[in-house]
Swiss-Prot record:
The keyword Cytoplasm applies. One of its GO terms (biological process) is methylation. GO terms for cellular component: cytoplasm. The gene is pcm. Belongs to the methyltransferase superfamily. L-isoaspartyl/D-aspartyl protein methyltransferase family. The active site is at 83. It catalyses: [protein]-L-isoaspartate + S-adenosyl-L-methionine = [protein]-L-isoaspartate alpha-methyl ester + S-adenosyl-L-homocysteine. This is Protein-L-isoaspartate O-methyltransferase. Pfam families: PCMT. GO terms for molecular function: protein-L-isoaspartate (D-aspartate) O-methyltransferase activity. Signal peptide: none annotated. The keyword Nucleus does not apply. NCBIfam families: pimt, PRK00312.1. Its EC number is 2.1.1.77.
């Protein structure tokens, strides 16, 4: 009897500690939204709600988890990073997503951006070329309730033609140009958000809109992303 009571007491302590930990992370997310996003012109309510909801700390390695809600990119292994919260929100807002939008992400990474997109629309496709990252992202997405994200391992330069056309495509790695196959897979009126420029240097986040089958480019801001990785021939 005493052993059972001791076990119940231990479970209660663990459960209380976990609840307190998650409340603290919720408070950190709210602070992140207020101080990093709203104060810097992220105004789309759906985007803000998604950023308040997705547990970013679950999508970063344990050794950097205490910095999950800081205004910085963080390493996630294999030479890759998770973008700072502001950039995730900015790119999401620029895509102008609706609940019935079909969106493609190039560069799954940890799965965080895909989870944010899944808060906004029902059809999310994501491609990751680094196999261990893809497996980890799939596991984290499932653990956090975003298992409906369609994930593929492969070269994102070629897009996902079987699932095309897309209302929006977000690229989370710096490309030296706009991949033609990604533009082809946009719907008429679709929006492609992509960092363009040389590797390991300043790039520019571009918004490419498809109008009458032709690309219309608009430069959004200077950025710096990890290079767009291609499959080796």
């Amino acid at each position: 009897m005493r052993a059972r009571l001791s076990l119940l007491a231990l479970l209660l302590i663990v459960g209380t500690a976990h609840a307190a930990y998650e409340r603290a992370r919720t408070n950190e997310r709210e602070h992140m939204v207020e101080e990093q996003l709203i104060s810097r012109d992220i105004t789309d309510e759906a985007t803000l709600a998604a950023m308040r909801t997705v547990p970013r700390h679950r999508f970063v390695p344990e050794d950097v988890r205490r910095s999950a809600y800081d205004d910085n990119p963080l390493p996630i292994g294999h030479g890759q990073t998770i973008s700072q919260p502001y950039i995730v929100a900015y790119m999401t807002q620029a895509a102008r997503l609706k609940r019935d939008s079909r969106v493609l992400e190039i560069g799954t990474g940890s799965g965080y951006q895909a989870a944010v997109l899944a808060e906004l629309c029902d059809e999310v496709y994501s491609i990751e070329i680094v196999e261990p990252l893809a497996h980890q992202a799939a596991a984290t997405l499932k653990e956090t309730g975003y298992e409906r994200v369609h994930l593929r391992i492969g070269d994102g330069y070629n897009g996902w033609p079987e699932a095309a056309p897309f209302d929006a495509i977000l690229v989370t790695a710096g490309a030296e140009d706009v991949p033609p196959k990604l533009f082809e897979q946009l719907k008429e009126g679709g929006r492609l958000v992509i960092p363009v420029g040389p590797a390991h240097s300043t790039q520019f986040l571009k918004l490419v809109t498809k109008r009458n089958g032709k690309p219309h480019l608009h430069t959004l801001m200077p950025v710096r992303f990890v290079p767009f990785t291609r499959e080796k021939p």
